[in-house]
Design a protein with these regions (language model features):
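Signature of Asx- and small-polar-rich beta-strand/turn repeats characteristic
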Residues: 1-576
Length: 576
């Protein structure tokens, strides 16, 4: 049982003595020993709060109008004497400001849920990140490429046409399409005069030494006035008059072009489809033992022999059509014969886009640095695998045909950054930062659907945090807008002594960014693409994907491998 002890003044006076707390003057206890209780000795005192009626909340209110109506209805209940609805009223203005803020917050909440999934994402940046998690490279488009042939004057013989030099931040030579200015060389000051015409800009992709002797080269026919280079030809002979072609070497590119109609001899009747670019694999200078280098007496056995150059090119550059080499009457000079087709040097590869230099905003210390470029669209350059597997813009040792093509999924934006001035460290773009160390000066280019381009930097773990002033050097020009027609280019900027600039073939390779619906369709299935080779059929399938292979087969080596390395070598040989 529970006993109670209470302090009193006297038995007949129950109040507590003076100086004692009345609540603490009594205590209850029991005489049980060693019997612990599972309950707390504190006596609970619960005071149930008064329940107020819950307000009616319309959870369907998600925009400005509904939030404004909801708050005005609530104020009609809490302030029944207030009936003002004039927009100039202070209370109404406060309600509308809160409705605007609620509308923005609601949008952010909806956007966070929407962008969280590939099937519902609307921003292109979100689609790109979701696709990256599925190992699917989202296509951001690619700029076009074109072969450009230049004719130079004798005063500019041996001049250098510079290409890009990224370490020195030097862009390629600027080429422009036709304008009201005369074709050929123009200055940088002339660009301001034609700015309103918005000419399409290209830039050279490599250095080129210009020679006047390469403007037009006659193909040698060994005395035959009616002959042609057959379809599929990979060799020809050039007339090396006065040894003017001594600068021609393997690796140079030549254009074979029909300049007159084979039947009429008129230049207007030349077939523009009979133009083809090849890259020389060998050049051999020799002479014709039967003919002399004397136009008045070519059969003179005592005169100096006619100098020629025998050239060859890759099978991949084989002529796709028969090239007529007949000699026909010249319309301008009666009795004088001119060749139907000629070869031209001074050929350079160029791609779509003009270089822009822009100072980026200052790097802040409080929030994530994510600047955006003021001009668009950013150029995306295709790349190919070189001889050693390293990715590059084009292979200067491969066939000329391959220079206009690039590998899928290997495009990189044409942009780089300089930190703290033109001589500071360089920042380079990467497809993502997952493989970047915390010291790597790399960044990711993210483009929205409207063409705006943002730059995303590392967080100190995956990629270095940016610091200092950043200078952006990038190119604008992308997509099918660069697929200009043949003979559209007409100007070269900053190079004197050039009388003619043109692209004999239409530019190609420009493609638009991949549509969002296509990303949603293909990205979830990207893992089904086979990228391994284990069985004989796998190796044959990989070999069939090469453009140079017509049909492939693979067999397993009969001899057992002596080591794993030997097994790999045999398998590689079987694949080849």
């Amino acid at each position: 049982s529970t006993c109670r002890v209470r302090l009193v003044v006297a038995p007949d006076r129950p109040p507590a003595p003076l100086g004692f707390d009345p609540l603490l003057a009594a205590v209850e206890f029991s005489f049980k020993v060693g019997c612990p209780s599972e309950f707390d000795c504190v006596v609970p005192h619960e005071c149930t709060p008064q329940e107020l009626p819950a307000p009616h909340i319309d959870y369907l209110a998600r925009d400005y109008a509904s939030f404004r109506r909801l708050m005005l209805d609530r104020m009609a209940l809490t302030l029944p004497a207030w009936h003002e609805r004039n927009p100039a009223d202070q209370m109404v203005a406060l309600v509308e400001v809160l409705a605007y803020a609620a509308d923005q917050l609601s949008y952010q909440q909806d956007a966070a849920a929407t962008e969280a999934y590939l099937g519902t994402a609307r921003r292109r940046v979100s689609l790109r990140r979701h696709a990256r998690l599925l190992d699917y490279p989202l296509g951001e488009g690619r700029n076009a490429r074109a072969w450009v042939v230049l004719e130079v004057q004798a005063a500019a013989d041996g001049a250098l046409l510079p290409g890009p030099d990224p370490p020195a931040d030097r862009p390629g030579t600027l080429l422009l399409t036709k304008t009201r200015l005369a074709a050929g060389s123009i200055t940088t000051a002339d660009i301001e005069q034609i700015a309103e015409e918005r000419p399409t800009a290209f830039e050279t992709m490599h250095d080129l030494r210009l020679y006047a002797a390469h403007n037009q080269i006659v193909l040698y026919t060994w005395g035959d006035e009616q002959c042609c280079l057959p379809q599929g030809a990979t060799r020809a002979t050039l007339r090396n008059t006065a040894n003017r072609l001594q600068q021609l070497a393997a690796g140079d590119c030549l254009l074979f072009e029909e300049v007159r109609g084979a039947a009429s001899g008129r230049t207007a009747d030349a077939d523009p489809a009979h133009r083809h670019v090849v890259r020389l694999t060998s050049v051999r200078f020799t002479e014709d033992p039967l003919f002399a280098d004397d136009p008045d007496d070519p059969t003179n056995p005592l005169g100096p022999r006619l100098q020629i150059a025998e050239i060859t090119w890759d099978v991949a550059d084989a002529l796709p059509f028969p090239l007529c080499l007949d000699l026909v009457e010249d319309d301008d000079i009666p009795g004088h014969k001119q060749p139907v087709s000629v070869a031209r040097g001074n050929l350079v590869l160029a791609d779509h886009g003009a270089t822009i230099v822009e100072q980026l905003p200052a790097v802040g210390d409080t929030q994530r640095y994510r600047p955006w470029l003021s001009l668009a669209p950013l150029s995306r350059q295709g790349r190919v695998a070189g001889r050693r597997g390293r990715m590059q813009l084009f292979d200067a040792a491969a066939a000329a045909t391959s220079a206009l093509h690039a590998a899928d999924g290997q495009d990189l934006p044409a942009i780089r950054l300089r930190q703290d001035g033109p001589t500071g460290p360089m920042w380079l773009p990467q497809p993502d930062l997952l493989g970047s160390s915390r010291f790597a000066r790399t960044f990711v280019v993210e483009t929205e659907a409207d063409g705006r381009t943002f730059l995303r930097f590392g967080d100190g773990r995956y990629g270095r945090r940016p610091a200092g002033a950043l200078l952006a050097i990038y190119r604008i020009g992308n997509g099918t807008a660069g697929n200009i027609g043949a003979d559209a280019l007409a100007h070269v900027v900053g190079i004197s002594g050039v009388s003619s600039v043109r692209n004999p073939l239409a530019a190609s390779g420009g493609r638009e960014p991949e549509p969002s619906e296509q990303v949603r369709l293909y990205a979830p299935e990207a893992f089904r693409v086979q990228r391994r080779a284990i069985t004989e059929a796998d190796y044959a399938a990989v070999a069939d994907q090469q453009s140079q292979v017509g049909r492939a087969g693979a067999t397993r080596a009969k001899a057992p491998p002596r080591s794993p390395a030997a097994s790999r070598r045999r398998r590689s040989a079987s694949r080849t």
